[in-house]
């Protein structure tokens, strides 16, 4: 409601300096430096590294998010294992979604991986097969969006 202050909720979590939680909820999670968690967003059982952005109304559960990732408003991750398996190339056997550094998750469509990491992930022996199997299920970001650029920059 516009003009009304709504408290955020933080339970059993660690939130680092510079991170802002705007009346969202953070439960059993760790948030790195300089993250922004927007209104009505929720983070549960997740590790979010520095410089990440979680949009208004987004719900993130069981996610390991590397630095400088961006989650669009109303996105849900970790609530539909089958959808997550189709959408996200990197997942652990128990369903934890791993987002590479500088990734962006849109409401619909494929995950956007920072262009400077795509070739690294394709060449790395530990990730090359996953990238090959998921070809067409992710997109490469434009050249003006680097993995080392924080959302606020």
Predicted segments, located by residue:
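Left-handed beta-helix
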Residues: 1-153
């Amino acid at each position: 409601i516009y003009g009304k202050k709504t408290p955020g909720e933080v339970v059993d979590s660690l939130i680092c300096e510079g991170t802002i939680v705007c009346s969202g909820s953070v439960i059993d999670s760790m948030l790195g430096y300089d993250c922004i968690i927007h209104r009505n967003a929720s983070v549960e059982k997740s590790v979010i590294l520095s410089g990440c952005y979680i949009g208004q109304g987004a719900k993130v559960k069981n996610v390991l998010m590397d630095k400088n990732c961006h989650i669009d408003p109303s996105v849900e991750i970790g609530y539909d294992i089958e959808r997550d398996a189709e959408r996200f190339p990197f997942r652990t056997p128990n369903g934890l979604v791993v987002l590479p550094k500088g990734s962006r998750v849109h409401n619909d469509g494929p995950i956007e991986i920072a262009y400077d990491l795509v070739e690294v992930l394709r060449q790395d022996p530990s990730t090359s097969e996953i990238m090959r199997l998921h070809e067409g299920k992710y997109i490469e970001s434009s050249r003006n969006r680097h993995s080392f650029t924080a959302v606020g920059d």
